[in-house]
Curated annotation (Swiss-Prot):
<dbReference type="GO" id="GO:0061640">
    <property type="term" value="P:cytoskeleton-dependent cytokinesis"/>
</dbReference>
<keyword id="KW-0547">Nucleotide-binding</keyword>
<keyword id="KW-0131">Cell cycle</keyword>
<keyword id="KW-0132">Cell division</keyword>
<dbReference type="GO" id="GO:0015630">
    <property type="term" value="C:microtubule cytoskeleton"/>
</dbReference>
<dbReference type="GO" id="GO:0016020">
    <property type="term" value="C:membrane"/>
</dbReference>
<dbReference type="GO" id="GO:0032153">
    <property type="term" value="C:cell division site"/>
</dbReference>
<dbReference type="GO" id="GO:0005525">
    <property type="term" value="F:GTP binding"/>
</dbReference>
<keyword id="KW-0498">Mitosis</keyword>
<dbReference type="GO" id="GO:0000921">
    <property type="term" value="P:septin ring assembly"/>
</dbReference>
<comment type="similarity">
    <text>Belongs to the TRAFAC class TrmE-Era-EngA-EngB-Septin-like GTPase superfamily. Septin GTPase family.</text>
</comment>
<dbReference type="GO" id="GO:0032175">
    <property type="term" value="C:mating projection septin ring"/>
</dbReference>
<dbReference type="GO" id="GO:0036391">
    <property type="term" value="C:medial cortex septin ring"/>
</dbReference>
<dbReference type="GO" id="GO:0032169">
    <property type="term" value="C:prospore septin ring"/>
</dbReference>
<feature type="binding site">
    <location>
        <position position="73"/>
    </location>
    <ligand>
        <name>GTP</name>
    </ligand>
</feature>
<keyword id="KW-0446">Lipid-binding</keyword>
<comment type="subunit">
    <text>Component of the septin complex composed of two copies of each spn1, spn2, spn3 and spn4. Component of the sporulation-specific septin complex composed of at least spn2, spn5, spn6 and spn7.</text>
</comment>
Length: 331
């Protein structure tokens, strides 16, 4: 097929309004963003989410009493909220994972998390293959996983490495150093460098990824983000009066940490990354990369089963419209 040539119009036609047409339709429909938080109890997961969206959206599912027993398994808790900013409506599914990493034996503590992520892919695929497919498919696929690293100042725990390697295969992972104000600036810089080296050593493939069609601006932006990962963050829903004005902050042994001050922590960089530059890309990457890998494996498996059944003279497997897909086939 020949490359079409560019033609100059003699008069105004009006198809340039397609962008505003799309914009009106998208605003009318609203948007959806599904965020998972993974980290041990006391990491400040709920507080960071509430700080990110400047609203109380999540209650802590962790242990409120230090004498309370630890959970024996990793649980999954989903909170759904709708937030509005100007004319834009955003439906949030906030997925907490209480119990993760809290046991004495954390062997396979990641399995409920991986299963949940794959189950959402499976559910979406069932709807997609349904002969009476919905006009707008309900999307519960996890778009972003915030992975909380304890501010030890040393290195990643073996369990962190094991879980990160598995998570990055199925979801966009963004690591953060929780409660980073417990470290000095020098300790924080050294800790971040140590963790980055471990990411490379263990071949942990973190978001963002450079796509084949990324332009120079996107590539440079992604490179700048990678230089910040893992984000050293502090969350706070409390207002503290400093110099006569309220700020979102935390009081620590060195003074007051202003959450929104780039010199104090990297919360602002994380918020800008998640909300202002990469929100749509997180959603699209989930669909075009992680979900597409899952979909390909599932449909290839069904095709092989169908081919084998034909050769054996058995009835071919039915493409599912009900919970018939099994996530166990996805590796």
């Amino acid at each position: 097929m020949e490359v079409p040539s560019a033609v100059t119009l003699n008069n105004y036609v009006g198809f340039d309004s397609i962008t505003s047409q799309i914009n009106r339709k998208l605003i009318r429909r609203g948007f959806q963003f599904n965020v998972m938080v993974v980290g041990p109890s006391g990491s400040g997961k709920s507080t960071l989410i509430n700080t990110l969206f400047s609203a109380h959206l999540m209650d802590s599912k962790g242990r409120l009493d230090y004498q309370a027993p630890y959970r024996q398994t990793t649980e999954i808790h989903v909170t759904s909220q709708v937030v509005r900013e100007n004319r834009v409506q955003l439906q949030l599914n906030l997925i907490d994972t209480p119990g993760y990493g809290d046991q004495i034996n954390n062997d396979k503590c990641w399995e409920p998390i991986i299963k949940y992520i794959r189950d959402q892919h499976s559910s979406y695929l069932r709807r997609e293959l349904n002969s009476h497919r919905e006009k707008r498919l309900q999307d519960t696929r996890v778009h972003c996983c915030l992975f909380f690293i304890r501010p030890t100042g040393h290195s990643l725990r073996p369990i962190d490495i094991a879980v990160l390697k598995r998570l990055t295969e199925v979801v966009n992972v963004v690591p953060v150093i929780a409660k980073s104000d417990s470290l000095t600036l020098e300790e924080r810089a050294a800790f971040k460098q140590q963790i980055r080296e471990e990411f490379v050593k263990h071949d942990i493939n973190l978001y963002p990824y450079d796509s084949d069609d990324a332009d120079e601006e996107e590539i440079n932006l992604n490179a700048a983000v990678r230089n910040l990962i893992p984000f050293a963050v502090v969350g706070s829903e409390k207002a503290i009066i400093v110099d006569g004005r309220p700020i979102r902050g935390r009081q620590n042994r060195w003074g007051v940490v202003n959450v929104d001050d780039e010199n104090h922590c990297e919360f602002v960089f994380l918020r800008n990354f998640l909300m202002r530059t990469h929100l749509q890309d997180l959603i699209e990457t989930t669909s075009y990369y992680h979900y597409e890998k899952f979909r390909f494996k599932q449909l290839s498996s069904l095709k092989e089963q169908s081919s084998l059944a034909t050769r054996m003279g058995s009835p071919a497997p039915v493409y599912p419209s009900e919970p018939h897909l099994h996530t166990a086939t996805a590796q």
